């Protein structure tokens, strides 16, 4: 947990490989086991049974997956894969009300199970309106488009039906979403199952039942695809995504649907109480992702036209990814285990793998909050790398630090320092505190690779550290991080720490806007410099390794010489204008103790 927060330098072990120095303050330590477990609420056992005995000699997740397939997983929404079952949400929970150890609570920001978990490599729902048929809300292709995916109307005898969602039928797993609708007199029931395939095809299956029988017409429209002649079997379009990072070529079709007036229409003849199933698919096709065409065409006129086959292919592919990529984790507390799997899902959900042209998102890249800031923000990149380095496919962790290195900003000094991805300069276009090189080096120690890759990591880290140490005249004052020319990072704004208003050390009365040498940013910079030295050493570049180690040692010495307060026996931030230590302490004062290298 500590290394996820920040990083870096253990003052107590900084100087001599574990030997306590004069800078350290002896203190009592309590074992973590003394803390006990928190009080958990919810399901009595949050981990569903697998029916599979654990065998450490083989892949447990593969055994569970195979058992799921044998038991019909993927054939319908009543037969789920194990991780889908574990992370299922039903109804409109969480609704923001409940009781915990502190009493009753009411949280107005609860999501009510409305966000769509299913996503593709680049496509997802930034906002989602589940009470409407289709993909209604703000579709994102890497970021918001401002458009619905597609809408669907149901008509009987030319009369549009008003459908109401039965929210108690709402069910969501990471791989699909399903719910049920009825019309006013309850003569029509529509069960919807929707999902986004790996390569960005948005599919909705509709099972329609009529208590009376007769013709039911479905009319579907998509702002992405409106070109086509009446009688055609698909609509097409062209769309430049946000900031013109790429162009997609949407294709829209459905089983038995034909074009009429720029929309798709299909009339089903139903027998009373005999359900019929059909489907619609919107492919967000990108030239740089040729599989997006293949996945769409398989559902348009290929071997996945059948709704059940399309669904099974998508959810099976989704769940196979877990087997291929994540390690199995089990503790003595199943509530913790579920949190671990949920965290794996978060790492996956917040991954953009768009293979875009240009120098923005050409690599798989972890994104800070695809439903929020939605950019590769350097502040959190290290945290994501620390998690994704455990994925078996190295591209997920390597992609993030390679992307940061390739999109680094050239400073006035001529060095390139890590900077928020230029694909979305609105969020936030700064160089916040970060430990990307350190996290990248940790990922390299897990996965390895050619010496050229280690050399590249060393180069990225070297440029970043030198760029920050020489940042005195950047156009954006927030990117000036060493105003006094020493070996310490200085800031005047709490957001640079990532803790925002929780970085209370900035809040001394009369000190607003003043700069201080920081223990946290300097510790992170030391970690990056030290990691760059280690990467160069692994690459066999001893000259550059020695140079970066010298810089790392100089940073360490400046931290100890300038930020150690012998009275409080703690590293404190220090104001530049008068050399006084900051009066207020915060979590960030402890960053230098957080990692023992």
Task: Indicate residue ranges for each PLM-predicted region.
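Sec-dependent N-terminal signal peptides
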Residues: 1-11
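Sec-dependent signal peptide cleavage junction
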Residues: 14-26
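Terminal accessory carbohydrate-recognition/targeting modules of carbohydrate-active enzymes
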Residues: 23-334
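Amphipathic, well-ordered alpha-helical segments in soluble domains
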Residues: 137, 142-150, 175-177, 400, ...
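Beta-rich accessory regions
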Residues: 202, 209-220, 535, 547-550, ...
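The feature captures the catalytic groove of carbohydrate-active enzymes
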Residues: 273, 277, 281-304, 369-370, ...
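Substrate-binding groove/exosite segments of carbohydrate-active enzymes
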Residues: 311-455, 459-463, 572-597
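Active-site acid/base region of carbohydrate-active enzymes
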Residues: 334-356, 388-391, 395, 409-413, ...
């Amino acid at each position: 947990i500590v290394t996820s927060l920040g990083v870096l330098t253990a003052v107590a072990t900084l100087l001599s490989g574990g030997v306590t120095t004069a800078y350290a303050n002896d203190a009592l330590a309590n074992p973590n086991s003394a803390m006990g477990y928190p009080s958990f609420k919810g399901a009595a056992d949050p981990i569903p049974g697998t029916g599979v005995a654990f065998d450490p000699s083989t892949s447990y997740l593969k055994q569970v997956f195979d058992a799921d397939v044998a038991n019909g997983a993927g054939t319908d929404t009543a037969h789920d894969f194990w991780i889908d079952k574990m992370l299922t949400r039903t109804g409109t929970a969480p609704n923001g009300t409940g009781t915990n150890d502190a009493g009753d609570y009411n949280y107005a920001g609860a999501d009510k199970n409305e966000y769509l978990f299913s996503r593709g490599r680049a496509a997802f729902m930034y906002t989602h309106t589940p009470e409407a048929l289709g993909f209604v809300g703000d579709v994102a292709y890497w970021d918001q488009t401002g458009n619905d995916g597609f809408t669907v109307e149901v008509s009987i005898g030319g009369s549009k039906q008003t459908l109401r969602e039965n929210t108690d039928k709402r069910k969501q797993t990471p791989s699909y979403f399903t719910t049920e609708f009825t019309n006013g007199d309850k003569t029509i029931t529509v069960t919807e199952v929707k999902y986004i395939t790996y390569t960005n095809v948005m599919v909705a299956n509709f099972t329609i039942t009529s208590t009376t029988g007769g013709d039911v017409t479905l009319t579907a429209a998509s702002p992405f695809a409106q070109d086509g002649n009446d009688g055609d079997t698909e609509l097409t379009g062209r769309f430049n995504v946000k900031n013109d990072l790429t162009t997609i070529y949407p294709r829209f079709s459905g089983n038995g649907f034909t074009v009429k007036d720029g929309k798709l229409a299909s009339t089903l003849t139903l027998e009373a109480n005999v359900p019929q199933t059909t489907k619609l698919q919107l492919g967000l096709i990108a030239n740089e992702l040729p599989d997006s065409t293949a996945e769409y065409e398989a559902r348009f006129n290929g071997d996945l036209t059948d709704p059940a086959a399309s669904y099974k292919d998508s959810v099976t592919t989704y769940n196979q990814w877990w087997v291929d990529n994540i390690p199995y984790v089990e503790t003595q507390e199943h509530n913790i285990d579920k949190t671990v799997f949920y965290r794996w899902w978060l790492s996956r959900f917040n991954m953009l793998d768009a293979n875009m042209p240009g120098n923005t998102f050409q690599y798989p890249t972890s994104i800070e909050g695809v439903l929020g800031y939605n950019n590769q923000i350097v502040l959190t990149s290290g945290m994501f790398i620390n998690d994704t380095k455990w994925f078996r496919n190295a591209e997920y962790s390597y992609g993030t630090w390679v992307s940061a290195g390739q999109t680094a900003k050239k400073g006035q000094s001529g060095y390139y320092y890590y900077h928020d991805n230029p694909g979305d300069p609105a969020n936030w276009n700064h160089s916040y505190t970060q430990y990307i090189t350190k996290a990248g080096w940790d990922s390299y120690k897990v996965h390895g690779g050619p010496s050229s890759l280690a050399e590249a990591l060393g180069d990225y880290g070297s440029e970043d550290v030198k760029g920050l140490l020489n940042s005195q005249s950047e156009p954006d004052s927030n990117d000036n991080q060493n105003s006094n020319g020493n070996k310490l990072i200085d800031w005047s704004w709490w957001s640079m720490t990532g803790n925002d208003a929780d970085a209370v050390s900035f809040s001394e009365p009369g000190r607003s806007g003043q700069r201080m040498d920081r223990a946290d940013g300097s510790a992170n910079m030391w970690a990056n410099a030290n990691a760059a030295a280690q990467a160069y050493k692994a690459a066999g570049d001893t000259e550059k390794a020695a140079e970066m180690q010298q810089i790392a040692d100089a940073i360490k010495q400046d931290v100890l010489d300038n930020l150690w307060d012998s009275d409080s026996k703690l590293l404190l931030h220090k104001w530049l204008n008068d050399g006084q230590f900051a009066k207020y302490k915060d979590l960030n004062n402890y960053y230098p103790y957080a990692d023992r290298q």
